[in-house]
Curated annotation (Swiss-Prot):
Name of the protein described by the UniProt record: 6,7-dimethyl-8-ribityllumazine synthase, chloroplastic
Naturally occurring in which organism (per UniProt): Arabidopsis thaliana (Mouse-ear cress)
Catalytic residue positions: 160 (proton donor)
Class of enzymatic activity (EC top level): transferase
Function, as annotated: Catalyzes the formation of 6,7-dimethyl-8-ribityllumazine by condensation of 5-amino-6-(D-ribitylamino)uracil with 3,4-dihydroxy-2-butanone 4-phosphate. This is the penultimate step in the biosynthesis of riboflavin.
GO molecular function: 6,7-dimethyl-8-ribityllumazine synthase activity; identical protein binding
Length: 227
């Protein structure tokens, strides 16, 4: 006669449920053959939330403890150390009424954060599709700490919009990876001209200015911490 195999033993590690007045427990609950054996009185697998900290509260507490650990080193770029950093801005001429406003927002932001005019170079290309290859060339030149990529793609009656928008995004990403220099994506992809104008100095702000802030932080991060 074949002997019956004993049912598997599963080990469940509790991650979120714990009592408010108890410390984090390292105990586990074992399930064997369909019956559970609780190894600690401090654990509960009840569906009731009464008397227990929420999973989000537990996660927040654990994350806070991790962040406060003295041995952890946190590194970030600075927005107050723009002096000496050099930037290239690749701008698409297509939809120029929008891209000029984005460019103005970027340059004004650079000046606000102490980047000198002589450390900013603007390169115009026909459209957003052509941005990637130029950005990669500029990144590899070794002259710039970051490259801004500015354009505006607005949906029309055909699928041309999707092709250009996707190609522009992948082109900028490839330029950044292949050159090792931050190439910042500042190409608007909008449903209509109103959306584009709202994002180039209108009620939704100026995305060119936001792109410049990203470029400043990334350039500072690479220059001062990642060399």
């Amino acid at each position: 006669m074949k002997s019956l195999a004993s049912p598997p033993c599963l080990r469940l590690i509790p991650t979120a449920h714990r009592q408010l007045n108890s410390r984090q427990s390292s105990s586990a609950c074992y399930i064997h053959g369909g019956s559970s054996v609780n190894k600690s009185n401090n654990l509960s697998f009840s569906s009731s939330t009464s008397g227990f900290a929420s999973p989000l509260a537990v996660e927040k507490e654990l994350r806070s403890s991790f962040v406060q650990t003295a041995a952890v080193r946190h590194v970030t770029g600075s927005l107050i150390r723009g002096e000496g950093l050099r930037f290239a801005i690749v701008v698409a001429r297509f939809n120029e009424v929008v891209t000029k406003l984005l460019l103005e927002g970027a340059i004004e932001t650079f000046k606000k954060y102490s980047v000198r005019e002589e450390d900013i170079e603007v390169i115009w290309v026909p459209g957003s599709f052509e941005i990637g290859v130029v950005a990669q060339n500029l990144g590899k030149s070794g002259k710039f700490h970051a490259v801004l990529c500015i354009g505006a793609v607005i949906r029309g009656d055909t699928t041309h919009y999707d092709a250009v928008a996707n190609s522009a995004a992948s082109g900028v990403l490839s330029a950044s990876i292949n050159s090792g220099v931050p190439c910042i994506f500042g190409v608007l992809t909008c449903e209509d001209m109103d959306q584009a104008l709202n994002r180039s100095g209108g009620k939704a702000g100026n995305k060119g200015a936001e792109t410049a802030l990203t470029a400043l932080e990334m350039a500072s991060l690479f220059e001062h911490h990642l060399k």
